[in-house]
Amino acid sequence: GTLKYVRVEYAGQVITQNNKEQNGFSFYSVGSGTTLENLVSYKGNDDGFEFYGGTASLKNAISYGNSDDAFDWQDGWRGQDNTNWYAYQEGVANYGLEVEAKSVNNAFWPKVTNITLKRAAGTATEAQSEIQLDAIQFKKEGNGEYSNIIIDGYKNQTTPTAKNGGAI
């Protein structure tokens, strides 16, 4: 399938307190034959973009003013041709990137190039947590290959919660 030139506004919400949530864009096990290009998630109530497994890649994406993470993935997502991601966080927001793998068995090293993560002055976190002021969180076995990253306005660049230290 193909998803090109789509803008989703004011979407997403937490639907239960057990981290069941709806994002601006949610991709569940989407394959590499799918085209995801020129997408905008604007001022949603959860993540701008989230991948749950799959092999799809995302090109030319903007996450603007979403109230949780700008970009988030887990459950073995392994997109290999991701480029030109831009995040602007304001008001209430958490990480620019949340990178998670629940175990070593589903940590597949996605690749992302040309990332800009910008946080506006005075942006608060959902849980008022100091750690959520970081640009990138590597959670559990989260990993990947990232290049050409611009980070501005965050307290720290990464949260090293992965076993390997989570460094970029």
Where in this protein do the model-derived segments appear?
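Extracellular beta-rich repeat passengers
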Residues: 1-168
